[in-house]
Structures are given as C-alpha cells and as structure tokens.
C-alpha cells in the first residue's frame, strides 16, 4: 500500500476518524491504530504485481521483535533496580549484559538471515567453483520483510537506551507495541527514538488547527515531490535512458544520472514528508529526515543532511560505541570505515 495511492486514502480516513472519535478512551484508541498498523504493514508487504501473497510470518517477525525488546528492556531495568537495592552489582551487570546481548543477537540475526543468507550462499558457491569444486549452494525462496531494518533499529535502540540508563522502560506493552509499529514511519522511516515518541503517548491528544494545517501541508508537499517530480522524472526520462543506455549519447546518460539523483531524493524525502504529515494529523510529531542535502558543501555535510534519523542512529549506536574519533590516529578512520561498511551491507 503506497502513500500516493487511493488505497491508502481509503485506509487512512477511517483510521483518522476512529483515532479522534476515541480520544476519551486511550486503550481503545491505541488498540485500533495498532491493529491498523499491522494491516498497513501486511498490505504494504504484498508484491506490487500481486503474484505472491504476503507471507504471514512478516507480521510474526514484527511481533517477535516487539516482544523481545519489551521483555529484555524490562529485565534490564529490574536488574538495575535490584543492584541499587543492594544486590550484587557485578552479578546484576553481567545479567543485564546478557539480556542486552539477547536483544542485539535476536534482532540482528533475523535481519541478517533475510537480507544476507542468499548473498553468502552465492558467494560460497563462487569461491568453491573458483577452487575447482562443483558444489552449488541452494537458493532459498526468501522475501525480504519490508521495513525490517527500520523497525529493528528502532526497537533495538529502545533496549540499548534502557541498558544505558537513559530511558525508563514503558510499562504498557500496548503503548510500546504502538511505538514500534506506528504505520506512518514503519516502512521507510523516519526512525523514531522512544525518548521522543513515548512521552507523546502519555498526553491526551488535542486536535489543533496548527497540526491540521501543518499535516496537510506536509502531505501535499510530499505528494508533489513523489508524484509530480520523482515519478515524472522516472517515466519521462531516467527509466527510458537506463533501459537502453547504448541508444543515447554520453551527455544524455550523464543527464540521466543527475536526473536519477533528483528522482531518489524526491521519492525518499517525499515519502518522509507524507509520513510526518500523516503522523501530525494523528497528533504526533516525528523527526525530520532530510535537510536540503544537495545544498551541502562537502560529503560530511551531505551525510548529516541525508536520511538524518539513520545517520544519527548509526552515530549514537555504532560509531560512538566503537570509540568515535578517540584513540590512535588510525582508529577513527577504522571506526568510520566499519560504520560505512555496515551501512552498505
């Protein structure tokens, strides 16, 4: 289900109406949008041509990640409380680390299995054949769950923040599940931090004219980027050139490359604008994701302006824990290389 589709409009209007109609009943309101988010996720996961049904386990993986991080963070917090109450701090720290490890391994194992299993099987086949063996690895029929990187990073950062003592775990499983699967940003971001989102769930929502105006403006802005600019560039120019590049001059191919950079920006930032606008109509503020990246003066500034919620996530949960810019003269470059390598993977 694409944002820029009539199907999404038919989905969103009843959800919006139910959300505000149930504003005096927080539990029911949250449960309705939580169920709607799962429906949206499954509908968005269906192949565009409809040739295959959406695997049922897509929703199961999302639920598993939610339950895993809810349980792990609760146990981490309870162990920290026991240590403060006089329990053996070393034993508590060891057990807290084990629960954090369970969250990290559980989440990243699923992400790695679906994204890289066939990649490594094919690589092993190529290496074996290069060494003279006739072994051929099986190709697994795996469909990559849509948005798995985004919701994995989002739920994992919650557990890490609890482990660091920066966040008190959410006692309500319903609200935590809502945070993980909130449909406007579930499929392609922005990646939301629990410290920014969960406090908004503990405030009774108010339908304000400011939110309506901003929400509608961001949706309109995103649709113009996505449909008028991004889709038009693809249909009218870039796809045509890339289909038969040998039929065009070097200048036309170069223009197509520049056109494609504009196309992917319009697609991605347009989607983020719509997500921000839809969330705003529901009374939630989620972070900006793009800040005019093509006006950056260098690559470092471009990185900070493009998909900002991902770049800050990688900085806070990968680059800094590796040591950041500290250490020997070569260490910062290794940390940066490893971060970029993992991003590319």
Can you say where each PLM-predicted feature lies in the sequence?
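Membrane-embedded transmembrane alpha-helical bundles that form the catalytic cores
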Residues: 1-345
């Amino acid at each position: 289900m694409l944002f820029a589709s009539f199907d999404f409009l038919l989905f969103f209007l009843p959800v919006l109406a139910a959300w505000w109609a149930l504003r005096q009943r927080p539990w029911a309101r949250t449960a309705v949008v939580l169920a709607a988010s799962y429906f949206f996720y499954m509908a968005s996961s269906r192949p565009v041509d409809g040739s295959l049904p959406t695997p049922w386990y897509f929703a199961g993986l999302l639920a598993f990640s939610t339950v895993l991080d809810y349980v792990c963070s609760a146990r981490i917090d309870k162990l920290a409380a026991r240590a403060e109450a006089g329990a053996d701090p070393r034993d508590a720290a060891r057990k807290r680390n084990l629960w954090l490890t369970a969250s990290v391994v559980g989440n990243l194992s699923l992400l790695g299995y679906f994204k890289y299993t066939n990649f490594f099987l094919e690589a092993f086949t190529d290496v074996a054949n290069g060494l003279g063996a006739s072994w051929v690895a099986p190709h697994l029929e795996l469909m990559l769950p849509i948005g798995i990187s985004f919701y994995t990073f989002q739920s994992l950062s919650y557990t890490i923040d609890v482990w660091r003592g920066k966040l008190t775990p959410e006692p309500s499983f319903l609200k935590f599940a809502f945070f993980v699967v909130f449909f406007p940003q579930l499929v392609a971001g922005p990646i939301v931090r629990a410290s920014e989102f969960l406090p908004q769930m503990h405030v009774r929502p108010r339908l304000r004219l400011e939110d309506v105006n901003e929400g509608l403006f961001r949706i309109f802005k995103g649709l113009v980027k996505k449909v008028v600019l991004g889709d038009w560039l693809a249909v009218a120019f870039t796809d045509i050139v890339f289909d038969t590049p040998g039929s065009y001059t070097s200048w036309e191919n170069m223009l197509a490359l520049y056109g494609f950079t504009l196309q992917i920006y319009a697609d991605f930032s347009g989607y983020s604008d719509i997500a921000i606008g839809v969330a705003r109509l529901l009374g939630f503020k989620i972070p900006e994701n793009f800040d005019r990246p093509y006006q950056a003066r260098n690559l470092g500034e471009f990185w900070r302006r493009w998909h900002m919620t991902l770049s800050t996530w990688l900085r806070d949960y990968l680059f800094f824990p590796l040591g950041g810019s500290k250490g020997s003269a070569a260490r910062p470059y290794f940390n940066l290389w490893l971060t970029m390598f993992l991003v590319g993977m």
